[in-house]
């Protein structure tokens, strides 16, 4: 975990890397790390006990109402079959009237999960929904006693988060000062030019960060019903159409949540396309020596082997070496992975010719879009001749940096 954050091994090992973490993913890892630092072992235990106590209490309360709970071993998730006089549709109607979404299984069961945000108001709301559906009267709960239904053998006996850093910063002020000390060790655009990737957006303006804490954007559940996410659907569709125009491509997917995930997705799309036209045997990826380490790492993780083509003394791709490597491997070549402009900030003058060389071999061109901001307004991947491209969330979409 620490090595992944500090060195991102694909920079060093390239095609020999065993991981491929992107800055956008590192942000989530950093947030999880700070969460553990702030709460420490005792804080994490208390949160877990609270969650499990609420779940245990609800299990007993709903069982008394006639619901049958099916998870023999549980921590935070319960699944109930309904009494004969209660239908899933009846329960759903009552829940929706109180603006609550439950999980509805295909066989008629109903379930829900508890987390650290669940409070007494939520408990009473759930109790109300299930009691009304069962046509029973219950009293409002004012306190949840600590309780556990876990078997003794499942309870952890060893210590964790024992390092000093997890046992020092448990107040807001201490945490703020700790994060500030770490920040002072870093280099950013507030200090100087950043040598790697400086042609990309490395500064996120405050206006771009505001939606992160806007209640109109955040807290939507990934499994929320379609009729409750119409605004998101409009946003996704509009963004997809705009990106089609910007990139010159025919289709867009917004599912990958980082550059590394985007690379993996793009290469899988290329593989699926080649298989669909009877070329599934192609298993080699051509990659310039100047490429970002994530490119060969992604190729290997997708099951490809890599072939490296040379660059000249100015950092440009050696077109003749690329042509020779492509020709030598044309029967097995699946794709070229190329960054435009390159990681060194160079606009390859022969990019269109490079794409033509690859296409003549029956292969596809994957363009790493890490530096997309440097070409917008001048050209786009579709015009250049690329077939697939990813756009980084922490650059093009200005999500916070994790590295």
Where are these regions (language model features)?
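Active-site C-terminal subdomain of aminotransferase-like
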Residues: 1-61, 65, 70-72, 388-403
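Conserved phosphate/anionic-ligand binding catalytic regions in large, soluble enzymes, centered on
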Residues: 23-28, 113, 187-207, 255-266, ...
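Gly-rich Lys/Arg/Thr-decorated short loops/hinges at beta-loop-alpha junctions or inter-strand turns
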Residues: 37-43, 70-74, 155-156, 213-227, ...
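Conserved PLP-enzyme active-site core in the AAT-like
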Residues: 62-63, 79-80, 93, 231, ...
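Conserved PLP-binding catalytic core of the aspartate aminotransferase-like
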Residues: 65-94, 114-117
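Noncatalytic alpha-helical scaffolds and linker/capping helices
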Residues: 94-97, 105-132, 136
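Flexible inter-domain linker/hinge segments
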Residues: 120-195, 199-207, 212-218
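Conserved N-terminal alpha-helix of the aminotransferase class I/II PLP-enzyme fold
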Residues: 171, 216-257, 262
